Amino acid sequence: MRIGIVAGELSGDQLGATLVEALKKKYPNAEIEGIGGPKMEAQGFKSLYPMDALSLIGFLEILSKGLSILNIRRKIIKYFKHNKPDIFIGIDAPDFNLTVEKKLRASGIKTIHYVSPKIWVWREYRIKKIRKATDKILAILPFEVEYYKNRHNFEAIYVGHPLAKNISLEIDRSKYKKRLGLENVELPILSVLPGSRTTEVTRLLPLFLDAIEKLQESGYKFKAIMPLAKPSLKPIFDQYNSQIRSLGIEVLETNSHDVLKASDLSLLASGTATLEAMLCKLPMVVGYKLSKLSAFIGRILIRGHSYWAFPNILHKSEIIKELIQEDCTVDNLFYELKRLFDDKQRNNYIVQEFKKIHEHMVVDTEEKIIEVLDSIIEKS
């Protein structure tokens, strides 16, 4: 069996790694190739192009590197047309993958899109392309199935999120503190995750650091830890090394999973990390900033959606504070961090609500995906 997969960024690499591992167990001799990151490659995946080349965000970044991405997309389509897989799976990255899927499906290759494009937030017109591009949408958020059915009469299948299955309902924080060498830390631990993309970290890290500095100057005592999401971000961290050191922030060359599981509270960028932090039952403050042009265009295209952070979307209310664009200032971050440290009753409520959401999300994701994959291949 031959399986094609394209994942476009760190979160896609995480999803892809667990999927490739499950596929290898089910089909030991399967050839699985395409575009993926180091976690997928560690499971035996063959990446034809570096995944980092697709990890862009915002309209300015797309304009500056768009030709390179288009060239890779053209080559990957040509490759799979000449080396036809039994099925192709596009993981997230809809602006890249839907075109790949559409071209491959038109040539007779069965396709799956794993992680629904957020058409329930913006650019709903993409449903037309989705219909042409994919045999099945695999949704990782429970409400998406109902959205597709009721609004577009299109079948999406809820497969859960592997993080919901892999993260325990009850977190033994002492275990992860010990793993990170923090077992003797008695202060509250604040994890700081300013993003996984260069543009995110460049915009958010200085704001996060200044807010933490104000918090410390106000007398709050805590231990801050920050994972280095990938080596390519180290030059940005190095620019702020003196401030990071003066604030006593420990930069850990480890994955975000362990850092979040060892934490009591979190300050982080909007994105998949907020879902992970929610599953780790962490009260949090979320910040995010796009370039001015990206934000301007985004507001034109976005469809009246109230929330950016996954916990708020899933809870259908602002259970955690999200500070987006002009609201993402040092003063606002500082104020919300103070609330995070001070309001224990609110934090307890947040933790209990996160547990309820987590319980609802648990599904054997990889088994469900393989079940869908098998049914599609059998029909071909």
From Swiss-Prot:
Catalytic reactions on record: a lipid X + a UDP-2-N,3-O-bis[(3R)-3-hydroxyacyl]-alpha-D-glucosamine = a lipid A disaccharide + UDP + H(+)
Domain of life from the UniProt record: Bacteria
The entry's keywords: Glycosyltransferase, Lipid A biosynthesis, Lipid biosynthesis, Lipid metabolism, Transferase
Gene Ontology CC: one annotated term: membrane
MF terms (GO), sorted A to Z: lipid-A-disaccharide synthase activity; phospholipid binding
E.C. number(s) listed in UniProt: 2.4.1.182
GO biological process: lipid A biosynthetic process
Pathway field: Bacterial outer membrane biogenesis; LPS lipid A biosynthesis
InterPro entries with a match to the protein in the record: Glyco_trans_19
Regions crossing the membrane: none
Its job: Condensation of UDP-2,3-diacylglucosamine and 2,3-diacylglucosamine-1-phosphate to form lipid A disaccharide, a precursor of lipid A, a phosphorylated glycolipid that anchors the lipopolysaccharide to the outer membrane of the cell.
HAMAP family linked: LpxB (MF_00392)
Family: Belongs to the LpxB family.
Protein name: Lipid-A-disaccharide synthase
